[in-house]
């Protein structure tokens, strides 16, 4: 019996879906077909995601196909998956995380702190924008949408002096050698670097097939980060970030909430037992909300 994987049509999405397809074929000897689906986020390419609003812009149509039974599983970038999974579906596996950080690629080869004042930086994410402003208020941040190839082309055409992208996407699309700097002090997007495999609840057969793809450490980090973001009701339209990693048996997590201009930037840190990932994520969210995050979020949501 053929297994159908639902995926977006972009080059990066197909790389991700093929990664899962190759595994299933080699490991289990099953036949796998990719079903390419256009999502709302793919159709709207000229408007910042924060302006469109709404969650699940890159997954809704794929989830619908999964619920209807026209596909057997879906492969997403974990960072695109909304915090609340539709009834009847669940995350069956989260793959081993690629390098989770953001990277800077500049035309001049200069790092973030070396770029001349007034340099134009392209990024689509509010999370990245506020972290740039916090460090270099003298740089000009401009919205940049599109896939990795499109963003790299715009950089090379001179529309931007530098762009900030996720390391994972840059590597998967073959641009790793062009990285100027890995921004390890930037807090990445929730789930950045991992793939999420979404399945129907109760579909034991598919669940067994994808089980070996699940990475327990990445799964626990994802729970901590996603619990944090769910408490904040955050999506693409809010400047927040959370990052968890497990070192020597301890889950260490840092996160931030900021206003749009990075004038009020609230950070926090937690560490504890990885098995209490959900509790750690929730308590860090509560701490940041109490420290002024709640007020910031109210202002942002009311202005949208």
From Swiss-Prot:
The modification S-(dipyrrolylmethanemethyl)cysteine is found at residue 236. PROSITE patterns: PORPHOBILINOGEN_DEAM. SUPFAM superfamilies: Periplasmic binding protein-like II, Porphobilinogen deaminase (hydroxymethylbilane synthase), C-terminal domain. CDD domains: PBP2_EcHMBS_like (cd13646). Its EC number is 2.5.1.61. Its cofactor is dipyrromethane. Coiled coil: none annotated. It catalyses: 4 porphobilinogen + H2O = hydroxymethylbilane + 4 NH4(+). Pathway: Porphyrin-containing compound metabolism; protoporphyrin-IX biosynthesis; coproporphyrinogen-III from 5-aminolevulinate: step 2/4. The keyword rRNA-binding does not apply. Disulfide bonds: none annotated. The porphobilinogen subunits are added to the dipyrromethane group. Belongs to the HMBS family. This is Porphobilinogen deaminase.
